[in-house]
């Protein structure tokens, strides 16, 4: 019964996030998105065998991501994993229609097996305040230890708090006390490549041939066609979508790979690993007992020393 309830909750959560995703496209088509959604739809796991998080396949620029997790946590306890996605305030980028739009952010946290998103009834008031307006989704029904967030407005979500529930090895022998690794990724802004391999308009467009720019045509939607004539008189047409700014003009001589536009991208992706220790309560008790024992030993040594000094003083030594 409990498993059926969890499955229904997962499907409901995914349905809500999908509705939000679709409605955001319909009602806010100019917003610039950072899509963990794409990774979810195209990769069985968000982390490749090399350790690279797959978001980096589309978001080619690198920018820092910072994570804060506690050094150690107790069994069956709720703790915060904080992902920080810094960028300059009021920064805007090129949207899909070529207009300037605010940046969006997204994040993925790959928790160790047994760790998962804490149920809301165990969230503290502080966590509820810090996660207001944030929707968490499991990467898949089978992987409740992988949590994705986004797209979210970047100006108010440069820090994303993930409420995490640790496992209890005393009730589930599949898990153990000790050190665990977390894999974390954070992104701001749109990608440069779609999962299909096609370029977005948020990237530098380059020439695929060498020659002289014969002419530049402006299309009705604001995009360009750059016609390049090689030494044999053959014309190659390079399509440049709306958004990037041309940095070439007619009669310019160019080589293969030379940029035709500026680089409009201002966002980027970053990933890092973190560690957390699942602390055994018996180990904590033992450690406390050890420190108490050391403290008592020190006190006894001091008392013994004073006693010896008194005896020596009485004997005139």
Curated annotation (Swiss-Prot):
Its protein name is Cytochrome f
Chief localization = membrane
Q: Write out the function statement from the record.
A: Component of the cytochrome b6-f complex, which mediates electron transfer between photosystem II (PSII) and photosystem I (PSI), cyclic electron flow around PSI, and state transitions.
Could you name the domain of life of the organism this protein comes from? Bacteria
Q: Where is the signal peptide?
A: 1-34
Which cofactors must be present for this protein to function?
Answer: heme
For this chain, the family text in UniProt reads: Belongs to the cytochrome f family.
GO CC annotation terms, alphabetical: plasma membrane-derived thylakoid membrane
Keyword field: Electron transport, Heme, Iron, Membrane, Metal-binding, Photosynthesis, Signal, Thylakoid, Transmembrane, Transmembrane helix, Transport
Where do the annotations place heme binding? 35, 55, 58-59
* Organism whose genome encodes this protein: Prochlorococcus marinus (strain AS9601)
Assembly and partners?
The 4 large subunits of the cytochrome b6-f complex are cytochrome b6, subunit IV (17 kDa polypeptide, PetD), cytochrome f and the Rieske protein, while the 4 small subunits are PetG, PetL, PetM and PetN. The complex functions as a dimer.
What residues form the membrane-spanning segments?
Answer: 284-304
């Amino acid at each position: 019964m409990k498993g059926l309830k969890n499955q229904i909750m997962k499907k409901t959560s995914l349905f809500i996030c999908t509705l939000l995703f679709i409605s955001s496209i319909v009602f806010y088509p100019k917003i610039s998105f950072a899509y963990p959604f794409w990774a979810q739809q195209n990769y069985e796991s968000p982390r490749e065998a090399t350790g690279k998080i797959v978001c980096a396949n589309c978001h080619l620029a690198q920018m820092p991501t910072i994570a804060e997790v506690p050094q150690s946590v107790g069994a069956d306890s709720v703790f915060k994993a904080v992902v920080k996605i810094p960028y300059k305030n009021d920064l805007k980028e090129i949207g899909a229609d070529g207009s300037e739009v605010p940046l969006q952010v997204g994040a993925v946290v790959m928790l160790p097996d047994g760790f998962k998103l804490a149920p809301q009834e165990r969230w503290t008031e502080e966590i509820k305040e810090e996660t207001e307006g944030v929707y968490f989704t499991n990467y898949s029904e089978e992987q409740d230890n992988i949590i994705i967030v986004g797209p979210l407005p970047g100006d108010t979500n440069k820090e994303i708090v993930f409420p995490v529930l640790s496992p209890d090895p005393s009730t589930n022998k599949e898990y153990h006390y000790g050190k665990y690794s977390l894999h974390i990724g954070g992104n701001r802004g749109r990608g440069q490549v779609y999962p299909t391999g096609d370029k977005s308009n948020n990237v530098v467009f380059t020439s695929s041939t060498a020659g002289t720019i014969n002419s530049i045509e402006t299309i009705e939607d604001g995009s360009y066609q750059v016609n390049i004539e090689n030494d044999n008189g053959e014309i190659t047409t390079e399509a440049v979508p709306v958004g990037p700014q041309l940095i070439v003009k007619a009669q310019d001589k160019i080589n293969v790979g030379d940029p035709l536009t500026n680089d409009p991208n201002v966002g980027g992706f970053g990933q890092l690993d973190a560690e957390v220790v699942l602390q055994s309560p018996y180990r904590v008790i033992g450690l406390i007992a050890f420190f108490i024992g050391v403290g008592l030993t020190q006190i006894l040594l001091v008392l013994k020393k004073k006693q010896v000094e008194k005896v020596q003083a009485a004997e005139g030594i």
